[in-house]
């Protein structure tokens, strides 16, 4: 699950849609292991923040099971593992290959990708998943904080439209954004 925030933020009380989806999946007996991917950095500044908050520091009551120079995997529970990475902004394909490698090492079996983070879409085929779900909580091309990434986001959204098996949207306006495709479903919060 590619998140739009870091597990450490959830551990400190931040709550958002992907946190609630993760908790629902964790409580379902038919769901196996979950690899929660922390917000992947798009800039050097964010990579430094992720390094400090997620690679150096540890989530309370977690166990670090693997640590590298640019990544770390923490075990939160028998079902939930958290992958933190600072490499994505410079080498997204390398970061995605590392995520795939980690899923294999942890014996995840058939992968289902559930992403809240549009920037991974051009690279998600590297993972070899059986099913791809994109959960759109907003149109990020309209956010001022992503103005410098607008072209990249537009390409990512085209990739999502063309390659996601399922697309969930939080608002009816996003149905139009995804061209009212038959694989797009409105799933409001709550």
Question: What are these language model-derived features?
Answer:
Residues 19, 91-96, 112-128:
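An aromatic- and histidine-rich active-site surface loop
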Residues 119-120, 173-175:
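Alpha-helix capping/helix-boundary segments
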Residues 1-61:
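N-terminal subdomain of nucleotide-sugar transferases
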Residues 173, 187-190:
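Carbohydrate-associated surface elements
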Residues 100-102, 148-167:
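Membrane-proximal helix-turn-helix segments that form the acceptor-binding/catalytic region
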Residues 42-106:
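A conserved catalytic-core segment of Leloir-type glycosyltransferases
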Residues 1, 114, 125-141:
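Active-site proximal beta-strand in glycosyltransferases
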